[in-house]
Amino acid sequence: MGRRRAPEGGTLGRALIRQQVQRSRSHRHTDSWLHTSELNDGYDWGRLNLQSVTEQSSLDDFLATAELAGTEFVAEKLNIKFVPPEARTGLLSFEENQRIKKLHEENKQFLCIPRRPKWDQKTSPEELKQAEKDNFLEWRRQLVWLEEEQNLILTPFERNLDFWRQLWRVIERSDIVVQIVDARNPLLFRCEDLECYVKTIDDNKENVILINKADLLTAEQRSAWAEFFKKENVKVIFWSALAEAIKLMGNSKGDVNGDTGEAITAEFENSSCDEAEILHKETEHLSLGEAASSEEDESEYEDCQEEEEDWQTCLEDSSSSDEEACGQDCKEGHTVDSEAQGRNTPQKRQIHNFSHLVSKQELLEVFKQLHSGKKVKDGQLTVGLVGYPNVGKSSTINTILGNKKVSVSATPGHTKHFQTLYVEPGLCLCDCPGLVMPSFVSTKAEMICSGILPIDQMRDHVPPVSLVCQNIPRHVLEATYGIDIIKPREDEDPRRPPTSEELLTAYGCMRGFMTAHGQPDQPRSARYILKDYVNGKLLYCHPPPGRDPVTFQYQHQRLLEKKVNGGEIKLQVVRNKKVYQIENVVDKAFFHQENVRALTKGVQAVMGYKPGSGLVTAAAVSSERGAGKPWKKHGNRNKKEKSRRLYKHLDM
């Protein structure tokens, strides 16, 4: 009886044969590993390109246009430029910066704020809302045109219409509109179109710029800014909410050392005595002008302290009738008192700015005596505080009132709705929410360093830290943090500013900020340094137009002179005296010499060399013999180590 066959015994063999045949067939139509090339030296029978092209990429479009124009391109070889990673600073060159400044001056008139559309008693609430939305949309389109067509960078302005509605209400109900700006860069936070809009609503309203954080400026720097705004015919007041709050807190506690807040301004008390007397005379002169104009017609605006729901844009019959009557009274009053206005115009336009820091009482007196025209509400002076977020509007109100009436936060845009507060009978302060108004900037790094954009939400830390390194000299950074920043190479400029990597590496090593791989945590270090820059620990003040930034920051030069002359600079930690410098890789490889060693075999020392132990001195040999342990065979260590493995790096 024969052997029984498997039910599908021949299936595997036929499958392998079939796979081999299919592989040979497919190999004929696929590319092989052999090197082939298309020479295209024969006649092209498919020369007619009948392929339809409806869309092309930018590169294909450029090449097709060049082919139609008959342009030929030749590869440019041996023109290689190596850009190291540390050169990625994200900052503009001098030529690019000058070009952008020129574009800013040419398109300066397009920077405006949205206006409230005109309305009367016949306008319905729906029509007014639709008109406001249309004007706001047109304003948004104009700013988008600036960004796209002119390639300009704008600050992230406010895009919520409700915030602008609150600004309109504050301006309409204020007799004095105060713009609060940062003393380190006043022109960035100043909105010139807001001043024009205030005068458009009512010519009797006054514009004032309150320069907060002025204690960060020296007396010479404040004098320079006061002279600049005097030429611009703008009234400015130098004020520091934090310094005044410390001063008032010390006085209220009755401490013997309660003049700690006064120490900030004690340097300038002697130079500001004459200015205080002139200011007193000016306030008396303005009080006489106010008494002369107190007989003007009274406006019938509603009270400043209203509920939140009364500040909507919807039209109310009572408010509309009052405002229409007020408009008629304004027209009549303008025709009657035109002669008196003409006599007071030269006195109004004459601006006297003083560079000393004002106190709380001086600030209130200036507010009271500044407005000499017709008030919005009879017997009450309303001062509206507007400006960018995080410039100190709420802090100013808390300092003036003496207690915390408005919540304060380091986060920009903390105030969500306006508030009206009475300082005393007849004086009302109105705190407007912080509005980021459109302004020109060069880079987004400038917005981060100015406090406009939050530091904790930044994505790239290199450009803002590079801007800090450009503004703050090397010796100031080293003296502030007690660090030693690595020096430039010998072939580099020794006076160049440090890069962001050099600063963050030194700061991270000093603070112990390390990543999981043992490297300095540069993003974390960048957040600390940028917050110190925004808070004023690393101080840089922008000069007025036309002034040299280096000479304007003369305190940096004084610190360098003290360091050169051997003056004491108090550091936070003990500094290492060793100066680290960036090593030159080419020089290190050129001057590097390998160690010369003698190769021996056996366990006996030859010419002073012992296998595995290197050079052996006579003292070591005598001490080894005197130990009395001849059975110890220490010479067997690394005795059989092959030399070709130890010195394989010397082979070609």
UniProtKB/Swiss-Prot annotation:
Positions contributing to GTP binding: 212-215, 387-394, 431-434
Biological processes, Gene Ontology terms: nuclear export; protein transport; ribosomal subunit export from nucleus
Signal peptide as annotated in the record: none
Localization annotation: Cytoplasm; Endoplasmic reticulum; Nucleus, Cajal body
One GO CC annotation: Cajal body
Entry similarity comment: Belongs to the TRAFAC class YlqF/YawG GTPase family. LSG1 subfamily.
Protein name, entry field: Large subunit GTPase 1 homolog
The organism of origin for this protein: Bos taurus (Bovine)
Encoding gene per record: LSG1
